[in-house]
Structures are given as C-alpha cells and as structure tokens.
Amino acid sequence: MSESVHTNTSLWSKGMKAVIVAQFLSAFGDNALLFATLALLKAQFYPEWSQPILQMVFVGAYILFAPFVGQVADSFAKGRVMMFANGLKLLGAASICFGINPFLGYTLVGVGAAAYSPAKYGILGELTTGSKLVKANGLMEASTIAAILLGSVAGGVLADWHVLVALAACALAYGGAVVANIYIPKLAAARPGQSWNLINMTRSFLNACTSLWRNGETRFSLVGTSLFWGAGVTLRFLLVLWVPVALGITDNATPTYLNAMVAIGIVVGAGAAAKLVTLETVSRCMPAGILIGVVVLIFSLQHEQLPAYALLMLIGVLGGFFVVPLNALLQERGKKSVGAGNAIAVQNLGENSAMLLMLGIYSLAVMVGIPVVPIGIGFGALFALAITALWIWQRRH
C-alpha cells in the first residue's frame, strides 16, 4: 500500500492495474444501472416523461458540485477519493435495491460520479510519466468504452430476466470497484492545504469559465462538445421510447444493443479523427457534426432493425470524428490559459448543463404527448441547424 509513484512508473504497475480495473467496474455499474433503473421505472408504471428526469438528477449533481470536486481530488490522495466516490455509488445502487425512491438513489450515484471524474484522470499522471502517460490515457478510454458496451447490454438483458438481479449486479460492480481502489497506492495529495472557502472556490471556478469563454477557440470547443454530449444522452432516452413504436419490440435489451452500436461507432470515428484532423485543421470535423443531425432524422423514420443498427453505427462514427478534435483543442488551449484540470471541470459543467437543458426539453415534449418519431425528426433537424450555425459563427470569428 505504500508503493510510490517514484519507484514504479511501469504502465502495468500494481497501482495502474488497480486504477484500470476500478474504472472498468465503476463505468460498468454506471451504464448498467441506468438501464436497470429505467426497467424499474417501467415495471412500477412511472410515466414515460419521468425517464429523462432520472438522468437529469444525475447530471444535476455534476453541475452543483462542479466548482468543488477538482479541489477535492487535489487535496487528498486520489485513490482514496476514488474509493469514497465509488462507495457513494454503491450506497446509491444498494438503496434502489432496497426500495428507496430510485430518483434519490440515482442522485447519490451522480454525486459519487461527480467526485470520481477529476480523480480518475488526475491519478494517471501520478502513477506514470512521459510517453507512458499517453498510453495510460488510452487504456483508461479503452476500459471505459468496454464498460459502456458491456454495462449497457448487461443492464438491459438482466432487467429482462429480473430487475432486482440487474440492480444487485450494479451494486456488486461498485463494490468490486471499491475493493480495486484499495490496491491503489496511497500517494501524496497534489495540492494539500488549500482554502475551503466555498465563495472563493466558486469565484475561482467562475474566473476559469470566463477565461475560456472569452477565447474564441475554447468557446467554439465548449459549445461543440456540449451540444454533442447533450444530444448523445438525449438519444439514449429517445431510443427507449422509439424501439417499441418503430420496431414493435418491448424488451429492455434492444435499446441497449442499439446504444452499443453508437459506442462502437464512436471508437471508429475517434480513430479516423486522430489520423485525419490536427489542431490546425479542426474545422474538418464540422461537416460530420451536421451529418449527425441528418442521420438522426433519417434514423427516426426507420421500421426495420438492420437499417436502424447501421444508421446508429454511422451516427457513432460521425460523433467520434466530430468530438475528438474539439476535445483536443480545448485541452491544449485550456492547459495554457487556466490549466488542464480547470479546463476539464469547465467542460464538464458545459456538457452537463447542455444535457440538463436537452433532457428537459425532451421530457416536456413527451409529457405534452408529442409522438416519439416526430420528436426524433425535430431533434435531428435542430441539431444539424445548431452545428451549422456554430460552424458559420466559428468561420466569422
């Protein structure tokens, strides 16, 4: 437990293995829990408009704690912060298992996720260095994508068998993540002894927001990534209602399979962007962003499984090609102005605010009785128009 970052910077050190395993199990639990809890809402006859509210309480925790979680990660050993955060997730999942209101339990999971995010990326630079750090980030992303794919499908498949079994599996995944965190070496805090004056912390965070917003390139990146992830999470919930209407399938597993196609496509698109787009040619990604909206519109009109799977894979490819260069631009420019950690925290705030707004509009549309197919058509058209407007604005500035 006393292994030092200075004594072992191997990519496959005990500490690095523990981080990757913990990340996989934690992300697996996050994705499985979403679909397991959605199945619970269906089983308990909650109204359809309440489904996106579940994700809204989750991202609300991110927004509420955005000014503070970065300092928490830097003020304590990051492995212990990760363990505490996964403990909160475990408590939230277990509370849903034992009949506590699912929205309350899921909010607790959101608080844990908000605390976990800055620590999981920050610890990589403390466990390894140099070129190995890039590879470590690659391992982290690979484990996350694998967890999204397997967790989403597992949540839906297990929920079709028994909802309680699916929820229990999520709790076990979080429990495994807590155990894995124990094996992360207890490293020194990066910035101990900082002031915990909440007003000053909030002011400092708002200053970082202002600095990034005043820079044309980082503002462009923030708006683009926020639109993308807001649309992405809304599409997840759109699929849950779209599948029974368009395909006539009422199980919990099919929407998870469709979501998995998007995740696979993102990996392919991200790889293509890495080869074809540089920081100097970021605007090359913009046509892909516009096409996302067009393909969502076409997808909404489908009634057969094969075209639906293919179009969602294409949406993922376009999404990966669109968002990866924007992320790289923000990290590079943000690192020089407000620091990488602050840039990520501001980006998290923007993306989660967009998710909250888009999910709120989607929930309202469902509540007033707009059919899911017209919602999908309008959603795709508006997204394409928004990215077109962003591209025109970027070219003028």
Swiss-Prot record:
Pfam families: MFS_1. The chain crosses the membrane at residues 18-38, 53-73, 91-111, 145-165, 167-187, 227-247, 257-277, 281-301, 305-325, 344-364, 367-387. Residues 39-52, 112-144, 188-226, 278-280, 326-343, 388-397 are cytoplasmic. It is found in: Cell inner membrane. One of its GO terms (cellular component) is plasma membrane. CDD domains: MFS_MefA_like. InterPro entries: LysoPLipid__transptr_LplT, MFS, MFS_trans_sf. Residues 1-17, 74-90, 166, 248-256, 302-304, 365-366 are periplasmic. It is a multi-pass membrane protein. The keyword Cell membrane applies. GO terms for molecular function: lysophospholipid:sodium symporter activity. Keywords: Cell inner membrane, Cell membrane, Lipid transport, Membrane, Transmembrane, Transmembrane helix, Transport. NCBIfam families: PRK11195.1. HAMAP family: MFS_LplT. Belongs to the major facilitator superfamily. LplT (TC 2.A.1.42) family. Catalyzes the facilitated diffusion of 2-acyl-glycero-3-phosphoethanolamine (2-acyl-GPE) into the cell. This is Lysophospholipid transporter LplT. It comes from Escherichia coli O157:H7. The lineage of its organism: Bacteria, Pseudomonadati, Pseudomonadota, Gammaproteobacteria, Enterobacterales.
